């Protein structure tokens, strides 16, 4: 069972007991966004800024060309998706503006963790797939607004993606990854 609000678990060790979890800082959302971006980048590209997937997703955050074009049309900014700075700008734009349906819920405010989990799932699985899944869960009476238990009902890829980024699950697999360790040091997250 997920707690209502969580902080990202430091990569050194997974926290398994609720009472061991740090209290969220009142001034923040309870989510360390720098660590979240680092974990997301690791999941998307393994820190390979020039990675191109078989479906055409490019760069550190695996941006699809259509998303890059949409970013250019709306912002007027152009660039190469292989450019790490530009790729990150497109990712930030997409996360902040193109997934609004997962940020605000009319029936009671979801916790920050729930919002972030939905945005991550939509980023990885696609907003349409997530919307359909949430609709099915709500019909079955599953509360997707105040708990993160619904994350484990998704298919393996988006479930593992969200779990790794938010829970730090399977972090031991990656702890000895040289690129991950370099990035942790670079961002002072050792």
Regions found by a protein language model. Give the residues of each.
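Structural recognition of the beta-strand scaffold that forms the well-ordered cores
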Residues: 39-42, 62, 119-122
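Amphipathic alpha-helical interface segments
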Residues: 43-44, 94
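Gly/Ser/Thr-rich beta-alpha loop segments that engage phosphate groups in nucleotides
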Residues: 48, 58-61, 128
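RNase H-like nuclease fold core
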Residues: 54, 58-62, 66-68
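N-terminal targeting leaders of membrane proteins
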Residues: 27-29, 33-39
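Extracytoplasmic
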Residues: 35-36, 55-58, 115-116
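Conserved alpha-helical segments that form or flank metal/cofactor-binding pockets of metalloenzymes
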Residues: 44-51
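Non-catalytic cell-wall polysaccharide-engagement segments
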Residues: 2-30, 66-93, 97-190
């Amino acid at each position: 069972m997920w707690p209502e609000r969580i902080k990202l678990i430091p990569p050194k060790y997974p926290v398994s007991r609720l009472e061991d979890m740090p209290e969220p800082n009142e001034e923040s959302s309870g989510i360390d966004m720098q660590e979240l971006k680092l974990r997301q980048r690791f999941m998307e590209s393994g820190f390979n800024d020039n990675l191109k997937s078989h479906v055409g997703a490019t760069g550190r955050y695996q941006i699809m060309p259509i998303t890059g074009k949409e970013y250019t049309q709306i912002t007027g900014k152009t660039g190469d998706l292989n450019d790490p700075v530009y790729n990150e700008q497109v990712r930030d734009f997409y996360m902040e503006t193109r997934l609004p349906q997962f940020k605000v819920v009319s029936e009671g405010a979801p916790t920050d963790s729930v919002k972030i989990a939905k945005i991550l799932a939509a980023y990885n699985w696609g907003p349409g797939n997530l919307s359909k899944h949430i609709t099915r869960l709500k019909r079955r009476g599953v509360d997707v607004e105040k708990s993160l238990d619904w994350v484990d009902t998704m298919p393996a890829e988006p479930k593992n993606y969200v779990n790794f980024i938010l829970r730090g699950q399977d972090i031991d697999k990656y702890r000895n990854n040289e690129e991950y360790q370099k990035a942790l040091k670079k961002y002072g997250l050792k």
